[in-house]
Amino acid sequence: MSTAIDAGPARGGARIEIVNPATGAVIRDVAEDSPETVARKFARAVRGQKEWARVRIDDRKACVTRFGQLAQERIEDLAATLSGEMGKPITQSRNEVRGLQARIDFFLANVHKVLSEEEAGADADGRLEERISYEPIGVVGNVSAWNYPYFVGSNVFIPALLTGNAVLYKPSEYASLTGLKIAELMQEAGVPADVFQLVLGGGGAGAALLDQPLAGIFFTGSYATGRKIAEAAARRLMRVQLE
């Protein structure tokens, strides 16, 4: 599996300026994904997901546990990055990162229940037993919001990773640096780079993500964009969740 975070196209492609909304100052710029780079990331995610699904659940839990620990250890840095790019007061940013841990703990405590086999029934003489087992669905797209990227994103990418799926995570273009921080923490925690990948950019990058044959798309954002996603997902019978 790849071990490097791919944050967009090669030098010379489109760039996104990250602007501090409080001061108007440009913090930095980042590479914006093109349809070609999104397609390449999807292909890597497909390969990575197959390997990730074979990883023992306790080992996947260990990676997610470590991700949570790293986030709590680096609250000040993560909060400063979040406030700097989207304008939230620093106390609210700290509280958001702190609150991330409760979400992680919930999913860690319940993933075994979600993945446990269920007895669906048996015939009268007991010779036939029906059971339901659960498997990962594959590669999912996670399009997150600008205002609470840790809360909104983690509600999708944490359970997705725990249950053996790969994630193409598209933060809002107004929370791109926070997306990079999340990806760095994931990799440091042991999640393979192909299994959790960033898609950076605005509507064009989001459209390119939706063009991939995803197993599911999870979106938080505007009504207008959500409607377009729902229509596209319906045409392909793709799993979809909108907020």
Residue map of PLM features:
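N-terminal Rossmann-like NAD(P)+-binding subdomain of aldehyde/semialdehyde dehydrogenases
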Residues: 1-128
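Active-site-adjacent beta-strand anchor residues
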Residues: 31, 143, 168-172, 199, ...
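Short alpha-helical
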Residues: 36, 73, 77, 88, ...
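Small-residue (primarily alanine) positions within well-ordered alpha-helices
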Residues: 45-48, 160, 179, 233
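Hydrophobic packing residues within well-ordered alpha-helices of enzyme cores
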Residues: 104, 179-182, 209, 229
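Conserved small-residue-rich beta-alpha loop and adjacent elements
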Residues: 121-193, 242
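Conserved NAD(P)+-binding/catalytic subdomain of aldehyde/semialdehyde dehydrogenases
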Residues: 139, 190-243
